[in-house]
Design a protein with these regions (language model features):
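Class I S-adenosyl-L-methionine
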Residues: 1-280, 284-459
Length: 459
C-alpha cells in the first residue's frame, strides 16, 4: 500500500466505511433509503416541475428545464441531506438568478413576485406529498428488467427499474458498475441491490428536476482527464460525484442517504482531509462555488502534509467564488479552456446513449496547493497541456450530444417507441415516465384524470 492508498484508507475508516464489500452495521434500515419514499419524492418533484413550466415557459422558452434545475440547486441547502425538494419560502435571496432571467425576458417586478409566490406554494405541497409515509411495505418492491433502446444506428442495453408508478432507466454499463460499488452481495441479494439502485437513480433524477434533458449540474469531466490527473498528480478521489458518475472508488456525493451503500464518503463540505490530492468539479452554482473556495482555503491553511485540489468551475470573472479561487494565495495554476475546445460528460450519462457534451462556454481549471503539495505534485506547463488535451471534445460527430448552452435549442437522442404505440406520444397519457423520455412537439394539456399529461414534459 503506497502513501496515497494509506491516506484513502484512513479517510474511509474516519467515515466508518470498510474496504471490503460486506454489509456493515451502519448500512441498515436506519440509514437505508426507501424505494417507496424516493418514488414519492420523484413524483412530487414532477408536479413541482409542472408548475414551474406553467409559470415560466412563456418567458424562458423551451429550455425552461435548465432554469428549473439551476433554481432547484440555488434553493437547496447543500449541507443538508434529504432535502431534494427545495425550500418553500415565498421570498428567498437565492431566487436572484431566476428573477434576472425572467426580468431579461420582460417580466415586471409584480409578475415575478406572483411567480415566486406560486412556486413557493407548489414547493410546500411537493414537500408535504414527498414526506407522506407509505402504509404498505410492499410498496418498496422494485421490479427490474433488461431492455434495448435506440435507433438511427445507435443501440444500447439498459435496465428498467419500477417502483409503484415510477419507472426509471440506466445503462447496463452503469448498472454493472454499481454492482462492483455496492457494499452488499448483488448475487445473493438481488432484490436488495435493485432497491438500492432504484433509490440512487430516483434521488439524482429528482435532484435534476426529473426532466429527461436535465443533468448539467451533475456533469463530469471526461475519463481521459481523470486518467491524466491520476498519472501526473496522484488524484484518486472526487469531492463532487455520485455512484452513477464517479470515476474513482473514493468520492463524496450530495446524498449520503442513498450513496453510502455504494461507497460515498459523504457530503464534500463535511469532508476534511489533511493530506492527499483531490478533484473538485462542483455544480456550476455561484453559492456552492463560493462555499467550496472557503472550504478548500481553510483545509489548505491547516494542512501540514501535502494537500492539493484540482478545481473545475465556469469562467465567471465577476462572481465571488471564482475571484476567491483565482486570487487565493494557494492558487498555483489557473487555465482557461475556451468554448468548443473542451467537453464534459453528460450529467445524465447513466441513462443516455450519447455521453460527451462539448461546452459552449469557457471554463476555468485551477490547482490550489499548500507548499508541501506544490513540492510533491508540481504543476508544470507539460502537465497543464496534457490536461487541456484530455479535455478536448470528440472529433467524431457521432459521439457528440447537445452543446452545453442554456440558450441552445437543438437536441438529438435515440429512443425506442413505447409498446403498442405508432408515434412518440403515448396513447395512455397517465403512463409514468422516466427522466429519459423522448421529445415530441405537443402543447401543454391535462389528462383525463386531471393530472398533467405525459406529453407535458416533452418539448
Amino acid at each position: 500500500m503506497d502513501a496515497v492508498d494509506a491516506v484513502l484508507a484512513r479517510m474511509r475508516a474516519d467515515q466508518g466505511l470498510a474496504r471490503d464489500r460486506a454489509v456493515d452495521a451502519d448500512v441498515d434500515e436506519a440509514v437505508a433509503a426507501s424505494p417507496a419514499a424516493l418514488a414519492r419524492e420523484h413524483a412530487s418533484m414532477r408536479a413541482l416541475a409542472g408548475t414551474f413550466r406553467e409559470e415560466t415557459e412563456d418567458a424562458l422558452g423551451r429550455r425552461w428545464y435548465a432554469h428549473f434545475e439551476r433554481w432547484l440547486c440555488a434553493r437547496r441547502d447543500a449541507t443538508r441531506d434529504g432535502d431534494a425538494i427545495p425550500s418553500a419560502k415565498r421570498r428567498d435571496a437565492r431566487d436572484g438568478g431566476l428573477a434576472r432571467s425572467l426580468a431579461k425576458a420582460g417580466r415586471t417586478t409584480g409578475e415575478m413576485a406572483t411567480t415566486t409566490r406560486r412556486l413557493a406554494r407548489a414547493a410546500a405541497k411537493a414537500r408535504a406529498n414527498a414526506s407522506a409515509r407509505a402504509s404498505d411495505g410492499r410498496k418498496n418492491r422494485v421490479r427490474a428488467r433488461r431492455i434495448e433502446v435506440g435507433g438511427n444506428g445507435k443501440r444500447a442495453e439498459k435496465v428498467e427499474l419500477t417502483c409503484g408508478k415510477v419507472t426509471l432507466e440506466l445503462n447496463l454499463r452503469h448498472y454493472e458498475t454499481l454492482k462492483t460499488r455496492w457494499r452488499g452481495d448483488a448475487r445473493r441479494d438481488e432484490d436488495g441491490f435493485h432497491r438500492a439502485v432504484f433509490c440512487v437513480v430516483a434521488r439524482y433524477a429528482t435532484l435534476q428536476g426529473t426532466h429527461y434533458k436535465a443533468g448539467n449540474m451533475q456533469a463530469a469531466i471526461p475519463p481521459r482527464v481523470f486518467e491524466t490527473l491520476e498519472k501526473r498528480f496522484d488524484v484518486r478521489c472526487e469531492l463532487f460525484a455520485s455512484p452513477l458518475n464517479a470515476h474513482f472508488k473514493e468520492f463524496c456525493s450530495a446524498s449520503a442517504m442513498t450513496d453510502r451503500a455504494f461507497g460515498s464518503l459523504g457530503n464534500a463540505f463535511d469532508f476534511e482531509p489533511s493530506e492527499g490530492s483531490f478533484e473538485c468539479n462542483p455544480p456550476f452554482d455561484e453559492e456552492i462555488i463560493s462555499r467550496l473556495a472557503g472550504h478548500v482555503e481553510r483545509l489548505l491553511s491547516r494542512a501540514k502534509k501535502p494537500l492539493s485540489f484540482f478545481v473545475v468551475v465556469p469562467l465567471w470573472h465577476d462572481s465571488r467564488g471564482w475571484m476567491r479561487l483565482a486570487k487565493s494565495v494557494y492558487c498555483v495554476s489557473n487555465t482557461t479552456l475556451e468554448a468548443k475546445e473542451h467537453a464534459f460528460v453528460s450529467g445524465a450519462q447513466h441513462s443516455r446513449i450519447d455521453q460527451l457534451t462539448p461546452s459552449a462556454a469557457p471554463t476555468s481549471v485551477l490547482f490550489l496547493q499548500n507548499k508541501a503539495g506544490e513540492k510533491k505534485w508540481p504543476v508544470t506547463p507539460e502537465g497543464v497541456a496534457a490536461i487541456r488535451e484530455a479535455f478536448a471534445p470528440p472529433k467524431k460527430e457521432a459521439e457528440r450530444v447537445e452543446k452545453w448552452d442554456p440558450d441552445a435549442t437543438s437536441w438529438s437522442c435515440s429512443r425506442r417507441l413505447p409498446k403498442d404505440a405508432n408515434s412518440w406520444v403515448y396513447k395512455n397519457k397517465k403512463r409514468d415516465q422516466s427522466v429519459d423520455e423522448s421529445p415530441a412537439k405537443t402543447k401543454k394539456k391535462k389528462s383525463a384524470g386531471g393530472g398533467l399529461a405525459a406529453s407535458f414534459f416533452r418539448d
